[in-house]
Amino acid sequence: MDTSLNVRIVPMNGDHLDEVAELERVCFSTPWSRNMLSEELENDCSAMLVALDSEGRVAGYAGVQVILDEGYITNVAVRPEYRRKGVAGKLLRVFLDFAKAHQLAFLTLEVRASNAPAMALYEGLGFRDVGRRKNYYEHPREDAVIMTKEFDTNGTADAHLGAGGDGLSQ
C-alpha cells in the first residue's frame, strides 16, 4: 500500500514564512524565528523548499546552504500528521538532484542521535554516519550525528542558488 502523500515541492517565499515559523516551533526545541527564516530566504547561498498539500498548506520544508562545491542541509521539518508519508524524502530528493546537477562534492547534515526515523531516511537516501558533535543540541542536551552523502564529481562546481532557490522545484 502506498502511504506517500501527494505534495507539490516549490521554492519557499515570504508567503510561507508564518506557516514555516509555526512548523519550526512544533518540530524543534530551539526553533528558528520568523526573522531568521526571512533572512535565510534572502541569502544567495541558501535555498528553502516547501511541500504543499492539496489545499496549499505547508506540510513540510527543508533548507540547504551551498558554498563552492559543498552543500549543508540546514533544516528538515514535517508536520506531525504528515510524517512517514514521504514528504521529507521528496524535499531531500530535490536537493540531491540539484547537488548532482551542479557537481557538488557532498551534502552533509546533522541529526539528533535519538532520531532513528530520520537517520533511517537519510541512510536510505545514501547518507552515511561520519561523526558526532558532542552535546550539540539543547533541550534536551544531545549529540548530533553528522551524516554525509558524497557525489562523484569531475570538474568544477558552480552552484550559485540565488535568493529563494530559483530552479529548485518539482
Stretches with model-predicted labels:
Residues 34, 38, 113, 136-137:
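Conserved beta-strand edge residues that scaffold enzyme active sites
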Residues 45, 69, 115, 137-143:
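Short acidic/glycine-enriched loop/turn segments that link adjacent beta-strands
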Residues 89, 141-151:
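Accessory recognition modules or surfaces
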Residues 57, 75, 79-93, 100-102, ...:
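Conserved glycine-rich acetyl-CoA-binding loop
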Residues 85, 134, 150-152:
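Acyl-donor (CoA/ACP) binding surface of acyl/acetyltransferases
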Residues 108-110, 123, 128-145, 168:
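Conserved catalytic-core motifs of GNAT/GCN5-like acyltransferases
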